[in-house]
Amino acid sequence: MERAEFEQAIDEILDSLPDWAVARIENLRVVVEEWPDDEQDPDGDGLLGLYEGISLPDRGLDYVDVMPDTIWIFRQPHLELGLEPEALHEEVRRTVLHELAHYFGLDDEYLDEIGWA
């Protein structure tokens, strides 16, 4: 999957979010990178995505004039999974939704319980 197609898939995933989710998203950017850097993936585990920021439930009254939170989606680790196009698109979707769940305040333990880990 070429980068433009990968980015388009992410745009389509974001465009398909329900209205209740879109209405609550603010000060968030989604960035596609080829690979995570060493700080993002110190163990080199093939990180697919990463949320960096202050989740919605943790934002207080002092949450003003701050840099946007970031969801990083890493293209090459997705491609290295060796999936067929349809399965790859579904994995990208799962990654985007997983990182959005962190933005909404859900932790990995809970996401594992509901099958989103």
Kindly label every feature range from the protein language model.
Residues 1-91, 103, 107-112:
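Active-site rim/adjacent substrate-binding subdomains
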Residues 91-99:
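Short alpha-helical catalytic segment bearing the HExxH-like zincin motif
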Residues 113-117:
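Short hydrophobic/aromatic patches at helix-to-coil boundaries
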